[in-house]
UniProtKB/Swiss-Prot annotation:
Protein name: Small ribosomal subunit protein uS4
Entries under Gene3D superfamilies matching the protein: Ribosomal Protein S4 Delta 41, Chain A, domain 1, RNA-binding S4 domain
SMART domains per record: Ribosomal_S4, S4
GO cellular-component term (any): small ribosomal subunit
Organism: Endomicrobium trichonymphae
Top-level division of the source organism's lineage: Bacteria
Family: Belongs to the universal ribosomal protein uS4 family.
Length: 208
């Protein structure tokens, strides 16, 4: 399945909640803040019927997949990997998704959206332990240090992002503004995703 190229606002309307796919722009100009935006996409929106258990499981899986910008195949592969790990498959899945390099760049505040974070990584503008990594799915581990090459640290856009950075960096990450470097200090817990996800519903979806 190819990557979705349509309006990301439609995806939020489909899930009936903000997924913050456009970063900070979602807060100020979100379709969900308007009456029409609260309906599902389409001329008349979705009919108001009680969702089946399967539909609830599907919607939660789709919400998570869209939040991390993954194709169906990519998301399914993450779940298969999570199942093989020790512990809860749901918790393992969220851990794998959160430790993606593009997601960590976003969570550190080095990009205004996950899409921007993916582009920054794809263009080779991120170093992990002083080595250039241009693979968004690269899985980070405890102790990894994420930063920009020296020539990019003076970039106007990067400086503005650092200036606007708020104290919302999750506890499993740390950031040194003087060095413009972030560090993975621990593994993320299930409740530390950028947006609430009920991983148990996803497990039940794949268990069918």
């Amino acid at each position: 399945m190819s990557r979705y190229l349509g309006s990301v606002c439609k995806l939020c309307r489909r899930e009936k909640e903000k997924l913050f796919l456009k970063g900070e722009r979602c807060s100020s100009n979100c379709a969900l803040n308007r009456k029409r935006g609260k309906n599902s996409p389409g001329q008349h929106g979705a009919s108001k019927v009680k969702m089946s258990d399967y539909a609830k499981h599907l919607r939660e899986k789709q919400k998570a997949r869209r939040m991390y910008g993954l194709t169906e195949e990519q998301f399914s592969n993450y779940y298969k990997t999570a199942e093989k790990m020790k512990g809860s498959a749901g918790d393992n899945l969220l851990k794998l998704l959160e430790l993606r390099l593009d997601n960590v760049v976003y969570r550190l505040g080095l990009a205004s959206s996950k899409k921007m974070a993916r582009q920054i990584v794809n263009h080779g503008n991120i170093l992990v332990n002083e080595k250039k990594i241009d693979v968004p799915r690269y899985r980070l581990k405890i102790g990894d240090v994420i930063t920009f090459p020296e020539k990019y640290k003076s970039n106007v856009i990067i400086k503005k992002l650092i200036e606007k950075m708020v104290s919302s960096i999750p506890a499993w990450l740390s950031f040194d503004k003087s060095r413009i470097a972030g560090t993975v200090v621990s593994e993320p817990l299930a409740g530390e995703t950028s947006h609430p996800i009920n991983s148990q519903l996803i497990v039940e979806y794949y268990s069918k």
